[in-house]
Amino acid sequence: MSFFQNTCKPKGFAGKIMVNMMNTGHAALAEWGLTHIKIRDDDFCLDIGCGGGANLKRLLKKSPNGRIIGIDYSEVSVQKSKKLNRAAIQEGRCEVLQGNVMNLPFSRDSFHLIAAFETIYFWPDIQVA
């Protein structure tokens, strides 16, 4: 598997390293972006392409009484997101699903906010998604 393919859909041991690198490497831009978005303390948010779950954690912090769902099509990413957000998942404030942006299991109008941090360039068809 090439480096680029492992950024798109992390797999195996190299994928675990990639997900950790993304959690760290994407932090500054994600934190900056979140300063420009109004998120209420009880919002229901979706993070498409949640990767290693760092942005789920940020959204949970900005919406302490809200509920956050993350979805990613990489099994490695889903596992890391669940591990990083275990407490919020146990509290019922967070859910992490494995799935594809092209076939989301809910309607778009279900959420107050839908985010996609550094992921849309991997989507096969942005207009359809």
Predicted regions and their residues:
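N-terminal, positively charged/glycine-rich alpha-helical extensions of SAM-dependent methyltransferases
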Residues: 1-15
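Hydrophobic alpha-helical segments typical of transmembrane helices
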Residues: 17-18, 29, 33, 55, ...
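Conserved alpha-helix/loop element of class I SAM-dependent methyltransferases that forms part
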Residues: 24-43
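Class I SAM-dependent methyltransferase SAM/SAH-binding core
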Residues: 44-103
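A short acidic, Gly/Pro-enriched loop at the edge of an enzyme's catalytic core
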Residues: 102-113
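A short SAM/SAH-binding and catalytic strip from SAM-dependent methyltransferases
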Residues: 112-125
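A short glycine-rich, Lys/Arg-flanked "PGG" loop and its adjoining helix->strand segment in the class I
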Residues: 127-129
